[in-house]
Amino acid sequence: MKFTKMQGAGNDYVYVDCTKLPLANPSEVAVRVSDRHFGIGSDGLILIKPSDNADFFMEMYNADGSQGQMCGNGIRCVGKYVYDNGLTDKTTVNVETLAGIKILKLNVGDDGKVASVVVNMGKPELEASKVPVDVNALVEYKAAYRNTYKNDAKLCPLAVKALDNVENAVINEAILVDGKSYDITGVSMGNPHDIVYLDNDMDITKFDIEKVGPYFENHKAFPERINTEFVQVLDRKTLNMRVWERGSGETFACGTGTCATVVATVLN
């Protein structure tokens, strides 16, 4: 198997060109190559495949072999891979994923290689049942946001627009995890995220994400498991974030998670 290892913001995957030949047992391969001691070492496996609906299809697997719907950093690397390896000469590339078709804008440097990629990540999904979050598994679903935005529509026009036609959103709702109460906000960017805000007076590098992360990931409130972002708001333009990805554990970065975190921070 020929492969290329690439990273976006430290979010690293093993990439395989499957445009001509398929890869057998990709879930099993993902587990083997992702092992950082006995394999190549990565957050997962990404296959670049043909598509009937777009230029390419991105098929991704987490480190535990489970299939994911979307990866923001991963799809940026797909854009660089297909251009730099001559699979396309387009600088606007459409890539199909399980979360829909994403449009990539490639910035080509003077050396003829892709220097950066901008991705249209699409509209965030806030409807609880579509994130999905089971509101019945929360401490007590209050939906207090409804009165907040109804009583003061000028509070945040972006939030008001995002919540249009949303019946039940999970915004700053309490959840009991390993005996402790946390407030979460649920957002889907094609894959499920819950955002948790931490106190600024704590050292986020010492937060025990290895212990807490799996409890969130496998909580009964999240029927498809969950990616969890633990966030500190340093100021109105700066966030500090650590992420626990379902199926992969803590990763250096998460593109969809960063988008979900910004959405959640606006909502809050």
Please report, for each region that a protein language model flagged, where it lies by residue.
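A glycine-rich beta-to-alpha transition motif near the start of alpha/beta enzyme domains, typified by
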Residues: 1-113, 156-157, 194-268
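ATP-dependent small-molecule kinase catalytic core of the GHMP/sugar-kinase superfamily
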Residues: 98-197
